[in-house]
């Protein structure tokens, strides 16, 4: 069907009192296209529009300029949205609702303060019945599973400079004196898991936490005891330095099927200086031996195209991944999202204007550098797993496959066929198999989606 017709018909049929749009930065322009399609109904019926999410939080001056956006939610939106709806329902003025920037008919903007943190243990469960059932199916390990995200943590205790967590912490500390990072109670997590499993027949769980193993020992033990009753395979992501044999052994016994590590870059000095990730390569390699030893399948996520990076530095990332030998290795283009420390670095270096909107990190590079061109970055990305899996004696051919020429494309196609034949495992076991059954390499589509949203919280 035509989405433009669908959205226009929905607006006419539903006749909303408010249109709310939660958007990450790379989805912002699509959101504006949607608003463009409903502008006639918006103007005719005087329907206010609010936009929220991490992009609106960290680029409010930019977002509020758009003609069809009347309000911006800065920070968490659960309480602010409820307060706004209550005011609209009663026909009351809502220009002073906390967390909101409200634009009047003359274009004047009232910027309200941020209120205290939302109690994430009081939030209602996600109403999955609002969505078509096919929205619950996602790829994992070469199979399609019925799964949903379950939030266990909000925010992150670490300060990676490509991520919004440092600025999120700074914002809430300055405005409210509070730490944005917190953990949902185990009872609340259990209630949500039990509800989703019993009411919607879920087959797989993925935990929505930037660093799942930010749990301390007591909390992890509580989780494992709680999860015995759920008994579904699950996926989580964490940092290498949080891993121990004891932790992963406990999680494996209750259903840990797959996990992902954020490696990001292979050069120790560059990783520390540019990314604020202070760990030695030898320690990362040792940490990644733990899931391999236990038979837990894992993927490693890396990024390339950082400011001041070079092709040689990118090969340090390839070399480290080669030593780790994960079941799956993903690489993404650096995305200088608003609200990240590296966005400021990128602008200071003159590589982006403050108004530039960053696209998806699986898209072509927006940061154009003479020493490491977009074409080189794209070439490294497409041959990344080939460099990792094939012996170095094949690197000469792989380098040719980096080029997007007739010859390069031909060589890449041949190498890809060989790669799939030698290194691509069979799909995972069925949804009804025991959670401790053998596991295999996943299709990385799902994990790419999770990685993309690591840096961007929703409204």
Kindly label every feature range from the protein language model:
Residues 60-65, 247, 308-323:
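Catalytic cores of alpha/beta
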Residues 126-299, 319:
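Radical SAM [4Fe-4S] cluster-binding motif and immediate context
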Residues 8-11, 17, 105, 341, ...:
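Radical SAM enzyme core and accessory elements
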Residues 48-50, 73, 235, 299, ...:
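Structural detector of well-ordered beta-strand residues that form the stable sheet scaffold
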Residues 1-190, 199, 456:
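Acidic, low-complexity intrinsically disordered segments
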Residues 1, 212, 266-271, 275-277, ...:
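Conserved strand-turn element in the central/C-terminal portion of the radical SAM core barrel
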Residues 17, 70, 203, 257, ...:
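Conserved acidic residues
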